[in-house]
From Swiss-Prot:
InterPro entries: SlyX (IPR007236). This is Protein SlyX homolog. Transmembrane segments: none annotated. It comes from the Bacteria. The gene is slyX. It comes from Rhodopseudomonas palustris (strain BisB5). Belongs to the SlyX family. It holds the Pfam family SlyX.
Length: 71
């Protein structure tokens, strides 16, 4: 029965492909998880920098309220 050998070979090939796909999915999952952690860190850093910028801008006197130095 040559057909049985062919079927067995096809099943083996599918099992190998499935194994490689599982490995690829796990690698991609790890990559996406690491990227989300990095995105979360960067988002927090941007929020902190934005707050610092707002504080710095509010502490600077506006030029309309100051007299020029030659007065």
């Amino acid at each position: 029965m040559a057909n049985d050998g062919s079927l067995s070979d096809r099943i083996d090939a599918l099992e190998m492909r499935l194994s490689y796909q599982d490995e690829t999915i796990e690698t991609l999952n790890q990559t996406v998880t690491a990227q989300w952690k990095q995105i979360d860190t960067l988002t927090r850093q941007i929020a902190a920098l934005s707050e610092r910028l707002q504080q710095a801008e509010s502490s600077v006197a506006t030029p309309a309220n100051e007299r020029p130095p030659h007065y």
